């Protein structure tokens, strides 16, 4: 049985520092203090194995807004613990598991939410012993995306094909089963998921970080990408993906100044500006990564199909430049749901994206 609580433990526990080489990290993570790594992006994670019956992690979390949780997977079973803003800035112990069989266990601890939380891991405790770190996949994948990639409102199971529930306040968010995270697991790839709800390409557009909206053009090269956490540049030499998925275009219609979604991608002048900036970002990534394969996509969340037409044009122009770009269109692309995709819809997208990448990755 897995219990996931914040209770005080009375049994003797062995403390493990976060710098222990038996811990494996994935994601854009700040190691300025190697024993207190800071997580910014949803899906950034630690993986490790241990032999024992109980496991606790020490964390220090800051919640900026929303009803948030810490995510974990123990022996393939995903679970979450609710966090409280009352503990902001305090070190707390989170019991991940107890009463397990005294045998080998595989664990992933991950940041479940995006910029509404800052997460620091401070240590691991077990009544048993740590084992060697799991081997990392050789295949590497990176994603630049929006709320769908972040798994926002994915767990609102009663709202499949419907608008989001009112005042959900992030409590249905969980990045673990977002379609891009599922796809990475399906193809056996490590993933860096650079995703944020509401993000568009340009600063001043989209919905991220009201009222001073921040776009992917200012995020894609960041370690910490939200001002509350202290902006930091990313060192691209730390991770070189084989596959880069770019999933934006959903939020770009919002001008960031009014409540109207009045940016028209069919306007020739704006279309040229948007495409030019998109291509500039891809070309920069292509140079940094020595020619990976780029998968350009949106999602099944309803939107104007002309954004996808513009992305097709971008793909063609990139190909003419010698960049390996591919355009994915889902069966129900832009037409399946007025609200965020739920788990069943993420499963659908993951299955299709997995097949698409499998066909191009070799």
Cite the ranges covered by each PLM segment.
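N-terminal secretory targeting modules
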Residues: 2-175, 362
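A structural motif corresponding to the C-terminal end of an alpha-helix
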Residues: 179-190, 281-293, 317-323
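Conserved SGNH/GDSL esterase-like catalytic core that processes O-acyl groups on lipids
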Residues: 42-43, 164-266, 293, 302-308, ...
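Generic structural signal for well-ordered alpha-helices
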Residues: 278-282, 311-312
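Structural recognition of the beta-strand scaffold that forms the well-ordered cores
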Residues: 140-144, 149, 191-194, 242-247, ...
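Extracellular serine-dependent O-acyl
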Residues: 293-362
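Short, conserved loop/helix-junction motifs that constitute active-site signature segments
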Residues: 136, 238-239, 286-289
């Amino acid at each position: 049985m897995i219990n996931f609580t914040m209770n005080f433990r009375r049994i003797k526990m062995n403390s493990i520092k976060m710098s222990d080489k038996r811990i494996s990290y994935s994601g854009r993570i700040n190691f300025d203090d190697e024993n207190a790594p800071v997580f910014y992006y949803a899906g950034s994670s630690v993986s490790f194995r241990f032999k024992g019956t109980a496991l606790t992690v020490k964390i220090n979390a800051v919640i900026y807004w929303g009803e948030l949780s810490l995510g974990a997977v123990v022996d393939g079973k995903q679970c979450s613990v609710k966090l409280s803003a009352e503990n902001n800035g305090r070190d707390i112990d989170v019991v991940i598991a107890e009463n397990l069989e005294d045998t080998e266990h595989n664990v992933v601890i991950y940041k479940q939410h995006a910029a509404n939380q800052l997460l620091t891991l401070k240590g691991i405790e077990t009544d048993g012993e740590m084992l060697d770190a799991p081997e990392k996949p050789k295949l590497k994948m990176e994603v630049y995306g929006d709320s769908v990639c972040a798994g926002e409102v994915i767990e609102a199971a009663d709202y499949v094909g419907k608008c989001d529930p009112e005042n959900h306040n992030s409590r249905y968010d969980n990045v673990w089963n977002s379609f891009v995270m599922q796809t990475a697991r399906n193809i056996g790839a490590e993933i860096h998921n650079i995703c944020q709800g509401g993000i568009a390409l340009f600063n001043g557009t989209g919905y991220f970080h009201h009222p001073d909206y921040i776009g992917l053009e200012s995020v894609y090269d960041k370690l910490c990408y939200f001002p509350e956490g202290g902006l930091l540049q990313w060192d691209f030499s730390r991770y070189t993906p084989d596959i880069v998925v770019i999933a934006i275009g959903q939020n770009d219609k919002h001008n960031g100044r009014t409540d109207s979604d009045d940016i028209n991608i069919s306007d020739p002048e704006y279309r040229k500006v948007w495409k030019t900036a998109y291509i500039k970002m891809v070309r920069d990534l292509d140079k940094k990564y020595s020619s990976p394969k780029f998968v350009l996509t949106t999602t099944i969340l309803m939107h104007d199909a002309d954004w996808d037409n513009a992305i097709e044009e971008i793909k063609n122009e990139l190909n003419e430049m010698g960049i390996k770009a591919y355009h994915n269109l889902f069966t129900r692309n832009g037409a399946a749901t007025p609200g965020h995709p739920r788990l069943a819809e993420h499963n659908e997208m993951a299955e299709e994206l997995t097949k698409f990448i499998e066909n191009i990755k070799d």
